Structure formats: C-alpha cells, structure tokens
Amino acid sequence: MGNDTIANIITSIRNADIVKKKTVRIIATNTTKNVVRILLQEGFIEDAREHREGQKSFSVLTLRYRGRKEKTYITTSKRTSKPGLRIYSNSQKVPKVLGGMGVVILSTSQGIMTDREARRRRIGGEILCYVR
C-alpha cells in the first residue's frame, strides 16, 4: 500500500493552520514539488525551500497568514481524486472553484497544473485537489 502524498500535503497544512504553526515540513517527491510550486505561484504559501537530512529530502513550506486573527490564505482544501477512486475531467469540463477564486490542481499529460492553465491549453486530466 502506497502513500498519498497529496493528501499528506493538504493534511499537514490544515494541521499547521489549526495550531497556528508558521512552517510545515513535507517529504519531497516530484509530485509534491509540483503541487508546492502551484501553491506558491497562486499565493497560498509564502515560501518553499528544500531541506535534506541524510538520504531523505524535505520541502519546508512557510504558510501565508493574513490579518491579526492569523487566518491562513488556504480556507478550504479537499483531495478529490484518491488512490482508490480516480476522477478525470476532459478539457471542456474542467471545474472552477468559487467562480475562479480558488484553484483546481490537475495532473495532465503535460504535467501538474492549475485549472486555468489546463483550460488555456485545452487539455484535461486527473483532478487532484481543490484549494480555496
């Protein structure tokens, strides 16, 4: 049985938000690096850097908070396609989150990208998660 790295990212960020932790450490894989790159581009996290301990490589994410109440920019995140149930979408039916306010992260034949980029390139793929 394998690990669901995308669910690990989402859960780690959610748990860090609950305890108001500024940084999160996740295991670095090609998939997690691409998802972190998208979260960084879209402004959901403040910074991401690589950290190495022995043979293992980690990504250290700095969460982005707003206001005095220290609310994170990620209000809701949900894993859509799971290892036991894959969910795919063609290029015409790529979903939008909150009318474009959130981001859908897809895995396509041209790599992991956002819903906007997939619509622009007119390609579909596996819907990995929603972030708003």
UniProtKB/Swiss-Prot annotation:
Biological process (GO), any one: translation
Main location (coarse class): plastid
Top-level taxon in the UniProt lineage: Eukaryota
UniProt-listed Pfam families: Ribosomal_S8
Alphabetically ordered keywords of this record: Chloroplast, Plastid, Ribonucleoprotein, Ribosomal protein, RNA-binding, rRNA-binding
Record-linked InterPro entries: Ribosomal_uS8, Ribosomal_uS8_CS, Ribosomal_uS8_sf
Keyword Secreted recorded: no
Gene Ontology terms, MF aspect: rRNA binding; structural constituent of ribosome
Compartments, record wording: Plastid, Chloroplast
Family membership: Belongs to the universal ribosomal protein uS8 family.
PANTHER family registered for this protein in UniProt: 40S RIBOSOMAL PROTEIN S15A
Task of the protein: One of the primary rRNA binding proteins, it binds directly to 16S rRNA central domain where it helps coordinate assembly of the platform of the 30S subunit.
Record-given protein name: Small ribosomal subunit protein uS8c
Organism field: Cycas taitungensis (Prince sago)
Lineage: Eukaryota, Viridiplantae, Streptophyta, Embryophyta, Tracheophyta
